[in-house]
Structures are given as C-alpha cells and as structure tokens.
Amino acid sequence: MNPNQKIITIGSVSLIIATICFLMQIAILVTTVTLHFKQYECDSPANNQVMPCEPIIIERNITEIVYLTNTTIEKEICPKLVEYRNWSKPQCKITGFAPFSKDNSIRLSAGGDIWVTREPYVSCDPGKCYQFALGQGTTLDNKHSNDTIHDRTPHRTLLMNELGVPFHLGTRQVCIAWSSSSCHDGKAWLHVCVTGYDKNATASFIYDGRLVDSIGSWSQNILRTQESECVCINGTCTVVMTDGSASGRADTKILFIEEGKIVHISPLSGSAQHVEECSCYPRYPGVRCICRDNWKGSNRPVVDINVKDYSIDSSYVCSGLVGDTPRNNDRSSNSYCRNPNNEKGNHGVKGWAFDDGNDVWMGRTISEDSRSGYETFKVIGGWSTPNSKLQINRQVIVDSDNRSGYSGIFSVEGKSCINRCFYVELIRGREQETRVWWTSNSIVVFCGTSGTYGTGSWPDGADINLMPI
C-alpha cells in the first residue's frame, strides 16, 4: 500500500469513528431530553392518556438514578393514583390471636414525661397503624394529673402516634376532644372530635388536617361517639353517635361523612334498645358494629349499616356467652338475638366481637363484675343460633389478677384478606389504686393469626409503689 492509500484508509477509518461518536452523542442527548420531560408525566391506566404528576397525591417519593456513559440522569417514578378504600376482600380465616404491640406507657411514666390518657384505640392507614387516646392535658408526673378520673374536661385532646410509640411530650394533639373516633378513607384521615358542655357539646369533623363540618348536641345530654375507629367504604365514612341518657332511652344516630362533610344522618332502627361506644368493622358492602347496651342488656347490640342507601338495622349478638361487664355467670346468662337480655344491663364496658360465618369471635373481661382480666374465644353458632354456648379456642390476654378496661376492634387489609385485630385498655390508678391521685392507661394489641400460638398474660405491669403520686 503506497503512502497515499495509507492516508486515505486512515482518514476513512477516522471519519467512520467520528460519525459513530457523533451519532452516539445524538442518541445520548435524545435520551436525556426524553427522560427529563417524562419525569413530569404519568400514564393513566384507565385511558392511557398522559396526565401531569402534580395533582396526584404522592405517598412515597422514589428517585431512580440512571447512568449512561458519563451522563447522570435523575428520574422521578410517578406514584400510582391513591384510591378510596373499599374493603371488598374476604375476612381472613383465623385460629386465634397473636401478640402484636404493647406500649408500656405507665411503666415508662415512672421515669419520663408521658401523657395521662384513657379511651385508647388503634386505626391504620393503607401503610401504617397508629394508636390514639384521649389525653388529660397533663403528663403523669405532674400535679395536674390529680383527679384525672373525670371523663369530660375542656383540656382533653385526641392524641395520635405510630403504634407502639407511647404518648410522649412530642405527641401530636389532633383536636380538642373528650370523645372521639378516627378512620382513613384511603386518601386522608377523618377525626370526629366531641368537646364542650355536657348539655351542649360540639362534634367537629376534621379531614386531612382541616375542619370541614360540625354538629351540635341534639338531645342536650352528653353527645358521644365510638372511642374506636370509624369505617370508610368507597369514600363514605360512617360513625355512630349517641346523645341522651346513659342508663335509659337515648337518641342514637349514624352519620355518613364524605371528605369530612356530613352528607346524611340516619336514626337507629331495629331492636337494639340502647347503643353506645360501638366497635365497628367493614363487612363489604356495609359496616357492622358491636356496641354497649348500658341500660338493659349484658348481651351486646349489633348495628348493621348500609352505606349505599343509608338504611340501618340492629339486633343483639346471639351467643349465650355474653360480652359485657357486669354479667351473669355463663351457666345462667342468655341471649336470643333480637332483644336485650335484661341481665345486669345497667352499666357496662366498651367491647367487641365479629362474625365468622355462623360463629362469633369475641373478647371480654374474665371477671363477671369488674374490669379485671381479659379473654378471647370463639362461640360455635354464636352469630346465628340463639343462646349458643359452645366455646372453643379460648385465650387469656390478661390474667384475672390484673386490671383491664375498654377494648375494641380494628381492621388491617392484607394482600388477600382483611384481618381483625383488637386492643385492650389496661387502666391503672384511681379508683381502685388509691395510693395515687391519677387515672391513666397503657394498651396491649393482638391480631388474628392462621398459625399456632402459645399462652401468656400481658398486663400493664407497673408497680404502683414506684409511681409518682
């Protein structure tokens, strides 16, 4: 090859290499520009139209780093559209309950600044569970904790923390309330907060951190609500509220709420005679509540709520092993599904149960007369057969030598089914423990399991002699 041919060959190769490099740079530039603009677009699965990310609620902001040769491109992955919860999955099949959480608030109060509370409950958004309680406007090691046995003061507020985090000084005070309920509709939290004078209280409806609606007392006798989670189906949330006598006829209404706005109010109908402090759970396409009859029955009222047409029905749990306290012993207790049993009906305690086909799972104090101990079990035929008493799968949650209190249900949606969980309030202090002047609580939480489980007891555990007076 002569010199001229060498020069031509080298030049041709160089030109080809330069052309390839030029085309690569153009490809990189096009890719960079495309990815840059695509970070502001999302494909809608419904109609394949391009929609801006901006109006979509972002639950988690995920950043993906893409490396192309020496160029770094930062691309935001658009989140999926947040939707209302519909709770349409079936209920999980369980064999019993397994330990889930315990906050040890009273034990921690012996050496730290922990709120004085009562009326706790648990509720979950689609990704995380939270514990709530009504604070008394004071910590335990504080002279303001004296005489906190009283239920209704203007200083009480609804507290909210992640489940398992005790109510420390940094805890968020969601609203002013001496009675409350909370639930998440899939997009935001709804809080129902009752406060004010006994004869003229106000219920505030707070949605997504904003006051949206309110309603005043309709019977001028302690307007009150569930003290556990409400339930939202396809954007409509239901909450049971009562105003009137705690030991006689009262006026119960079921409120239907959409994004904090009251859209309908239905009166209680059916055979339930007295309804308070309902523990509600989704039973698609409706909502079912197990409540407290503080007037006539130690068997628990059932309230069925139709979310679509706002209709209401009520009855009583059929199980002859009844769930309220005080109650008759199991040999002499009765329940025939439709009416209160007129057995030690005056007074009571908040509790829960849920149907499982024809059977019923339930929890109650071990003591028949006081808020001591706690047990759960399943009653065969307890949902459909009057006065059924065949008990299986009994578990002790708190032994009979230790105090319990209110209890309630909450629901957790899994990949294939909806699990039922419950909490137990572990009350300490006055009236029973007179060495101290305060009344407060901790909680223990269990959830349904399809596995095996052992035995134990999970009381509050604080030594009252080590506690601030």
From Swiss-Prot:
<feature type="disulfide bond">
    <location>
        <begin position="124"/>
        <end position="129"/>
    </location>
</feature>
<feature type="glycosylation site" description="N-linked (GlcNAc...) asparagine; by host">
    <location>
        <position position="402"/>
    </location>
</feature>
<keyword id="KW-0735">Signal-anchor</keyword>
<feature type="region of interest" description="Involved in apical transport and lipid raft association">
    <location>
        <begin position="11"/>
        <end position="33"/>
    </location>
</feature>
<feature type="glycosylation site" description="N-linked (GlcNAc...) asparagine; by host">
    <location>
        <position position="61"/>
    </location>
</feature>
<dbReference type="GO" id="GO:0004308">
    <property type="term" value="F:exo-alpha-sialidase activity"/>
</dbReference>
<keyword id="KW-1032">Host cell membrane</keyword>
<feature type="binding site">
    <location>
        <position position="371"/>
    </location>
    <ligand>
        <name>substrate</name>
    </ligand>
</feature>
<feature type="region of interest" description="Head of neuraminidase">
    <location>
        <begin position="91"/>
        <end position="469"/>
    </location>
</feature>
<feature type="binding site">
    <location>
        <position position="324"/>
    </location>
    <ligand>
        <name>Ca(2+)</name>
    </ligand>
</feature>
<feature type="disulfide bond">
    <location>
        <begin position="232"/>
        <end position="237"/>
    </location>
</feature>
<dbReference type="InterPro" id="IPR033654">
    <property type="entry name" value="Sialidase_Influenza_A/B"/>
</dbReference>
<keyword id="KW-0812">Transmembrane</keyword>
<keyword id="KW-0946">Virion</keyword>
<feature type="transmembrane region" description="Helical">
    <location>
        <begin position="10"/>
        <end position="30"/>
    </location>
</feature>
<keyword id="KW-0325">Glycoprotein</keyword>
<feature type="region of interest" description="Hypervariable stalk region">
    <location>
        <begin position="36"/>
        <end position="88"/>
    </location>
</feature>
<feature type="binding site">
    <location>
        <position position="152"/>
    </location>
    <ligand>
        <name>substrate</name>
    </ligand>
</feature>
<comment type="function">
    <text>Catalyzes the removal of terminal sialic acid residues from viral and cellular glycoconjugates. Cleaves off the terminal sialic acids on the glycosylated HA during virus budding to facilitate virus release. Additionally helps virus spread through the circulation by further removing sialic acids from the cell surface. These cleavages prevent self-aggregation and ensure the efficient spread of the progeny virus from cell to cell. Otherwise, infection would be limited to one round of replication.</text>
</comment>
<comment type="similarity">
    <text>Belongs to the glycosyl hydrolase 34 family.</text>
</comment>
<dbReference type="GO" id="GO:0046872">
    <property type="term" value="F:metal ion binding"/>
</dbReference>
<keyword id="KW-0479">Metal-binding</keyword>
<dbReference type="GO" id="GO:0046761">
    <property type="term" value="P:viral budding from plasma membrane"/>
</dbReference>
<keyword id="KW-1133">Transmembrane helix</keyword>
<feature type="glycosylation site" description="N-linked (GlcNAc...) asparagine; by host">
    <location>
        <position position="146"/>
    </location>
</feature>
<feature type="active site" description="Nucleophile">
    <location>
        <position position="406"/>
    </location>
</feature>
<feature type="binding site">
    <location>
        <begin position="276"/>
        <end position="277"/>
    </location>
    <ligand>
        <name>substrate</name>
    </ligand>
</feature>
<keyword id="KW-1015">Disulfide bond</keyword>
<comment type="subunit">
    <text>Homotetramer.</text>
</comment>
<feature type="disulfide bond">
    <location>
        <begin position="421"/>
        <end position="447"/>
    </location>
</feature>
<feature type="topological domain" description="Intravirion">
    <location>
        <begin position="1"/>
        <end position="9"/>
    </location>
</feature>
<feature type="binding site">
    <location>
        <position position="293"/>
    </location>
    <ligand>
        <name>Ca(2+)</name>
    </ligand>
</feature>
<keyword id="KW-0106">Calcium</keyword>
<keyword id="KW-1043">Host membrane</keyword>
<feature type="binding site">
    <location>
        <position position="118"/>
    </location>
    <ligand>
        <name>substrate</name>
    </ligand>
</feature>
<feature type="disulfide bond">
    <location>
        <begin position="318"/>
        <end position="337"/>
    </location>
</feature>
<dbReference type="Pfam" id="PF00064">
    <property type="entry name" value="Neur"/>
</dbReference>
<dbReference type="GO" id="GO:0020002">
    <property type="term" value="C:host cell plasma membrane"/>
</dbReference>
<dbReference type="GO" id="GO:0005975">
    <property type="term" value="P:carbohydrate metabolic process"/>
</dbReference>
<feature type="disulfide bond">
    <location>
        <begin position="183"/>
        <end position="230"/>
    </location>
</feature>
<protein>
    <recommendedName>
        <fullName>Neuraminidase</fullName>
        <ecNumber>3.2.1.18</ecNumber>
    </recommendedName>
</protein>
<dbReference type="GO" id="GO:0016020">
    <property type="term" value="C:membrane"/>
</dbReference>
